């Protein structure tokens, strides 16, 4: 069998593209090739004849020129006749089109790349293709968990506990403290942040006040800035962030968001099916949600280009002790838009655990923080009810791993 035997670095200026090359190269493809060259280097050599006529590699040459590369590796194909050269130029492009993909293995490989913070777009697949690949057709459902009833039960979580809930992790701690995130993340990076911080409205239900919900404006900014800064440090460079908030504190949220290193792409609106009665002359029927990503990074998008900033989802049945509780389908919507299956989704204000349940239903992994021991209990019990078992539930406490049954049985009576 005849084969090539010599490779040289050849100045691009000496190469002669084939004038009748029928293969076209779109600007999008050239951009992908340029990204590939920057990441991997020029690995796949150009095939040429002894007159420096290009047989294969026209697209790579165009990308190299735009990258300012002056010499490229070339392999000489001495054994081809003129007719064989013409045929190979066509065959090299056409036969590649006959190859297919084992989509299950492809998903596994791309998920493993994202797990180590590697940009999946560098594989050559664009965002729409990745969206189709990971579209599992899952429709998240409301679980109707009774938060109010659970809050009345004895508390078994202690501050500092790290709960292992299947693949998910929950720490009972302070989101303004960097060490809380260090313990929670255990070396991993978040592929997405979606969170619902306190709104600073001084709400009080039958279970008591929501923590960190009544501060002076300056202190509330500092609170948000510290929390946002900690989030930014543990996010992958291509991770997006969604922050639900109250318009009455919109200025503090936006200032802290920007100061912590996030680019604000826009503000989405959750439109509820009915208004919420309050003291304002205009009754609120919506909640805003900041959307952005790290200023020093970029973002991933795994759906189409027809998604609106208006999100219409019914609010859940009343849970009086967590008035801003989000419906599961609402949270699943941005989760599926901005992450792939098996991605790590961070929620530093876990609340009643809606983000964790949305992650469980959409095959994501939730890492979450909650300051209030009572609401940590809610998250644990809500997860158990969702999966129907406490078999894979344990807590890391004082250096020991304890099963759920042992911890729950030691809760004091009220």
Describe the function of each predicted region.
Residues 159-182, 380-414:
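S-adenosyl-L-methionine
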């Amino acid at each position: 069998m005849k084969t090539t035997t010599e490779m040289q670095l050849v100045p691009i200026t000496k190469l002669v593209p084939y004038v009748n090359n029928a293969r076209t190269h779109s600007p999008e493809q050239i951009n992908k090739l340029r990204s590939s060259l920057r990441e991997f280097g020029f690995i796949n050599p150009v095939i040429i004849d002894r007159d420096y006529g290009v047989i294969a590699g026209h697209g790579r040459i165009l990308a190299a020129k735009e990258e300012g590369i002056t010499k490229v590796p070339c392999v000489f194909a001495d054994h081809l006749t003129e007719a064989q050269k013409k045929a190979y130029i066509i065959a090299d492009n056409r036969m590649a089109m006959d190859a297919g993909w084992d989509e299950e293995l492809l998903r596994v490989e791309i998920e493993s790349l994202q797990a180590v913070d590697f940009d999946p777009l560098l594989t050559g697949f664009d965002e729409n293709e990745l969206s189709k690949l990971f579209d599992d057709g899952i429709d998240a459902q409301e679980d109707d968990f009774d938060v109010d009833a659970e809050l009345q039960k004895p508390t078994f979580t202690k501050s500092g506990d790290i709960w292992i809930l299947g693949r998910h992790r929950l720490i009972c701690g302070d989101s303004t403290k960097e060490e809380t995130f260090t313990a929670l993340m255990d070396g991993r990076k978040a592929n997405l942040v979606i969170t619902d911080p306190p709104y600073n409205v001084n709400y009080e239900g039958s279970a008591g006040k929501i923590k960190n919900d009544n501060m002076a404006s300056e202190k509330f900014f500092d609170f948000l800035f510290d929390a946002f800064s900690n989030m930014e440090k543990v996010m992958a460079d291509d991770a997006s962030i969604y922050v639900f908030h109250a318009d009455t504190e919109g200025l503090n949220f936006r200032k802290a968001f920007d100061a912590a290193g996030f680019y604000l792409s826009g503000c989405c609106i959750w439109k509820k099916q009915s208004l919420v009665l309050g003291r304002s002359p205009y009754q609120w029927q919506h909640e805003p949600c900041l959307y952005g990503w790290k200023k020093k990074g970029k973002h991933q998008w795994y759906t189409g280009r027809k998604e609106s900033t208006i999100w219409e989802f019914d609010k859940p049945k009343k849970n009086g002790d967590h008035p801003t509780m989000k419906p599961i389908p609402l949270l699943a919507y941005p989760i599926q838009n901005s992450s792939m299956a098996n991605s790590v989704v961070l929620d530093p204000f876990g609340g009643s655990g809606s983000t964790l349940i949305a992650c469980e239903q959409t095959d994501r992994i939730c890492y979450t923080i909650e300051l209030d021991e009572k609401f940590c209990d809610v998250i644990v019990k809500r997860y158990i009810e969702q999966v129907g078992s406490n078999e894979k539930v344990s807590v890391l406490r004082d250096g020991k791993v304890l099963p759920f049954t042992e911890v729950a049985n030691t809760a004091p009576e009220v």
